[in-house]
């Protein structure tokens, strides 16, 4: 492995590119790989990601690289920033090139498709238990990270040394703070469920329900996230942090969120395909909705908001009817 490369980022979309830019600005030589060779070659030529992060110039220490084997041989620190539905596929791609020295982190927000398993379980299944694992999650929009605007995230993992090392790579005293969490499950889960609730917030606003309804939805969405997390062994208090409440509020209230905009379009009467085309990038919450629904039903946890969003997206339920069914539920203790 090369001595000078600090980390390789796998995933050259908006968020992967933004995190790579941030790492390089922190003084860490960084490689950036993506599955489309022509896209990486454009990044090499343009020294920016014009498609996803226009006008953000790459620092000198950031190098786009087309060869996956070269990227993995250059450093032991690997960061996956790919959609959750291809997370397992990318792990299978890199597995032949891994050595016992490698350490695997991800900033992917989601669960395994169909099963709803945590990505930690997916990684362990594919790679075995030898490799240290870590996750980075929190209230972050790619463009704001790329611009160097103040940002804070949570980092959690299977091994404290690696968790601390990843946190240190991102942390600086100017605009990027990292908070280390000891709750690996909570930090993984928050990023998936908040995407679903953000679609719901968009749906509510698209229907014209107003700020009261949006706030109620966020609050009850946090309750659903917490209930699911505790059932999986997470601590209730963990969901009040960056990867829980922080990410939930950001994604539900700002139109930089693809998930919120997707829900907004649906609430205004557009179809699923038309809404996805309008967004123009992956809407993680669409798949996350099915993942969370499957997980909650598998372990028997009631999540009425997520359930109604699932019915809208996957069973053609009318948006207004889903809203009415939520509003007509029997009163209950908070």
UniProtKB/Swiss-Prot annotation:
GO terms for biological process: carbohydrate metabolic process; glycerol-3-phosphate biosynthetic process; glycerol-3-phosphate catabolic process; glycerophospholipid biosynthetic process. InterPro entries: 6-PGluconate_DH-like_C_sf (IPR008927), 6PGD_dom2 (IPR013328), G3P_DH_NAD-dep (IPR006168), G3P_DH_NAD-dep_C (IPR006109), G3P_DH_NAD-dep_N (IPR011128), NAD(P)-bd_dom_sf (IPR036291). Sn-glycerol 3-phosphate binds at residues 109, 138, 140, 194, 247, 257-259. Pathway: Membrane lipid metabolism; glycerophospholipid metabolism. Its EC number is 1.1.1.94. The active site is at 194 (proton acceptor). GO terms for molecular function: glycerol-3-phosphate dehydrogenase [NAD(P)+] activity; NAD binding. One of its GO terms (cellular component) is cytosol. It catalyses: sn-glycerol 3-phosphate + NAD(+) = dihydroxyacetone phosphate + NADH + H(+); sn-glycerol 3-phosphate + NADP(+) = dihydroxyacetone phosphate + NADPH + H(+). NADPH binds at residues 14-15, 35, 109, 142, 258, 282, 284. Keywords: Cytoplasm, Lipid biosynthesis, Lipid metabolism, NAD, NADP, Nucleotide-binding, Oxidoreductase, Phospholipid biosynthesis, Phospholipid metabolism. PROSITE patterns: NAD_G3PDH. It is found in: Cytoplasm. Pfam families: NAD_Gly3P_dh_C, NAD_Gly3P_dh_N. Belongs to the NAD-dependent glycerol-3-phosphate dehydrogenase family. NCBIfam families: PRK00094.1-1, PRK00094.1-2, PRK00094.1-4. This is Glycerol-3-phosphate dehydrogenase [NAD(P)+]. It comes from Psychromonas ingrahamii (strain DSM 17664 / CCUG 51855 / 37).
